[in-house]
């Protein structure tokens, strides 16, 4: 796995130090600007004019086992809402000039009337309830990983300079928490959160479901791909493939909440070093996300208490990255305004 350019990072750091601003005055914006420059391989960095969000949608067998505050039927309804441009992330994307693409990987609905380009990558309807059975077959996992990689290549070929990964699937925080637990070797009690806002009794039950899933998977979690088969889903596997391929192609990714970060952790297990191409858009309220970010060495750009999902936190952070680029590109050098300084 090639890393972002160290030489360009050094040049960007030198330029940052030479700006007509007090040392350290730009804080995290300076760090983000250096990272973007290194991923682009050029200093000053190019403006981020083409940013693409792909939302991977799918249902989860565990959603019918008391782990979510909402019924699985919401997933299909939200796919249609994305397409109408009326979802939360749709409003943010419109405000910030981010392209949105939604794909059905495993929605438990035929989505009649939905455009073929949304449905053509479908791997299966829903996934196995991970505390009782594997989420996917090995072949389905491979298919979903390749779909994600293909979609990343398509987005990059279309001109995307920055990629975002969004999610939609009732119950998806349960397999995502299991993926993080598997990747970090942690028990369910440390990674399980309230998702869409479940009460204390449901949280305890959700912890038990996640731990039962981990116990059932056993040593298979040593293999990241087999982990996806046992504990993931079609949408999470596709997101993992998308994130891994973005890193292979040398295109930066701004991560969203738990689902994106769980997939990023898994992608980094599959392709060690992939995390160098990722930045964390925001800190979610889910404990597993913070644990995975710490493992990946990523500090969130925003901390707003968001738990919407959909890619919303990453989209909200896009203007911050654009601001970072603008500062490194457009602020005068001290040597330009005070020759000889």
Language-model segments: which ranges?
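N-terminal loops that bind phosphate or other acidic moieties
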Residues: 1-341
